[in-house]
Amino acid sequence: MVQLSKTGVRDTLKAGHPPAVKAGGKRVVKKSADENANVEKETRKTDKPRSVLAPSRMQHLSLLLSGPLEKLGHDFPETPVSVRHSRVRPSVEKPHISRIPCIQQPRKF
């Protein structure tokens, strides 16, 4: 179906919208410049300066950070890390079990 656009140029429309363009092996929809301009105007209106913080919020933030900063100043234990992460030796060793011969039938346990 061929229709005239607002500018008077003939565009081919498929299902009421312009056909997709292949880019990089995938089909990508071409958006008109009018739609992109509206989106940019809306984003400019919603931008607010975020760098300025209220003084009360800064004080609240410093109170939150004061606790964890004090905890980071603790002394580390003198035992080496390899000793702390080594496997625990059992107090009683398990007896060595001799190998059970292979039986061709299922066993009940």
From Swiss-Prot:
It holds the Pfam family DAP. The keyword Protease does not apply. Coiled coil: none annotated. GO terms for biological process: apoptotic signaling pathway; negative regulation of autophagy; ribosome hibernation. One of its GO terms (molecular function) is translation repressor activity. InterPro entries: DAP1/DAPL1 (IPR024130). The keyword Repeat does not apply. Residues 31-50 have a biased composition (Basic and acidic residues). Keywords: Translation regulation. Residues 1-51, 76-100 are annotated as: Disordered. Belongs to the DAP-DAPL1 family. Ribosome-binding protein that promotes ribosome hibernation, a process during which ribosomes are stabilized in an inactive state and preserved from proteasomal degradation. Acts via its association with eiF5a (eif5a and eif5a2) at the polypeptide exit tunnel of the ribosome, preventing mRNA translation. Plays a key role in ribosome hibernation in the mature egg by preventing mRNA translation, leading to ribosome inactivation. Ribosomes, which are produced in large quantities during oogenesis, are stored and translationally repressed in the egg and early embryo. Associates with ribosomes; preventing translation. Interacts with eiF5a (eif5a and eif5a2); preventing translation. This is Death-associated protein-like 1 homolog.
